[in-house]
Structures are given as structure tokens and as C-alpha cells.
A protein has these predicted regions:
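A motif-centric signal for short, conserved binding hotspots located
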Residues: 37-38, 46-47, 100-102
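Short, exposed beta-strand-loop hairpins at the edges of beta-sheets
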Residues: 106-123
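N-terminal signal peptide c-region/cleavage motif recognized by signal peptidases
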Residues: 16-18
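Bacterial N-terminal signal peptides that target proteins for export
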Residues: 1-11
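Acidic, glycine-rich flexible loop segments
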Residues: 84-111
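Boundary of Sec targeting at the N-terminus
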Residues: 20-22
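A low-complexity, Ser/Thr/Gly/Pro-enriched, surface-exposed linker/loop concept
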Residues: 41-92, 124-132
Length: 132
């Protein structure tokens, strides 16, 4: 009887986690988490102290913690009952940038700035929201 060498497959099982990690990142402070979803980037704040924009009447879930921008057009404040917080996401060090499908995010000591091809986007931090 012959024995076949076993081939380790555990590395293959980890591939989806690796791909997911490449699609998202967090700020060095651990307060901002961002993730790509198609051609849109979404960033969530864990803690914030600024006044949130008025909640739309049709928003019956969490409001003012999540922001998004696509490759064209204005940024959005999201009505979202979920989160993209992933404590295992790679850290985008201060001074570094992240590019994906027409959106670029810059990690800065003052917060996270994400901008699209139209020059529209947002800047967020614990103390500030600026949509432009």
C-alpha cells in the first residue's frame, strides 16, 4: 500500500481573510475604520464628539457614525445599522495614502481625508466632520 503525501491546505483557507484585509484599513488611533465596497469607500468613527448633521426622518437606525464617497459626486452621511469596524484591519500610518477605483484616502494626524476624482469627499476625526 502506498501513502500519498498530504498537502497542507490551511493556507488556502485563509485567502479570503487576506483579500478582506486588503480592502480595508484603520487609523493609527484605532478610531477610524474604512472599507471599500465596489467603487465606494466607507469610513466609520468609533467615537466622536462633534454635532451630527440632522437625522433624516426615514433613518431609524444608527446615524452620524458612517460616511461614504464614490469615484464621482458628493459624499454621504450613512444611515447604517452595521459597521465596518475591523480591529484586524491593517493600520494606514499617518502620512500614508490608500487608493481604490477613483477614491484616495489620506491618513493624517488630524483625521482621515477621503477624496474622489471630482475633488469631493470628507474629512473625519473624533472632533470634526467636514464634507466638501
Amino acid at each position: 500500500m502506498r501513502w500519498l503525501a498530504s498537502i497542507p491546505v490551511f493556507g488556502l483557507l485563509l485567502l479570503p481573510g487576506v483579500a478582506h484585509a486588503q480592502d480595508g484599513f484603520q487609523s493609527p488611533s484605532g478610531n477610524i475604520f474604512c472599507e471599500a465596497d465596489g467603487d465606494t469607500i466607507r469610513c466609520d468613527l468609533v467615537n466622536s464628539s462633534f454635532a451630527k448633521p440632522p437625522r433624516p426622518r426615514d433613518c431609524d437606525t444608527d446615524w452620524g457614525h458612517a460616511y461614504s464617497v464614490g469615484p464621482r459626486g458628493a459624499s454621504s452621511v450613512l444611515c447604517a445599522g452595521d459597521t465596518v469596524v475591523n480591529r484586524g484591519a491593517r493600520v494606514l500610518r499617518y502620512g500614508a495614502r490608500w487608493d481604490s477605483k477613483g477614491v484616495t484616502c489620506f491618513s493624517e494626524q488630524t483625521g482621515m481625508r477621503c477624496i474622489n476624482m471630482d475633488g469631493r469627499g470628507f474629512e473625519i476625526s473624533r472632533t470634526r466632520l467636514n464634507r466638501f
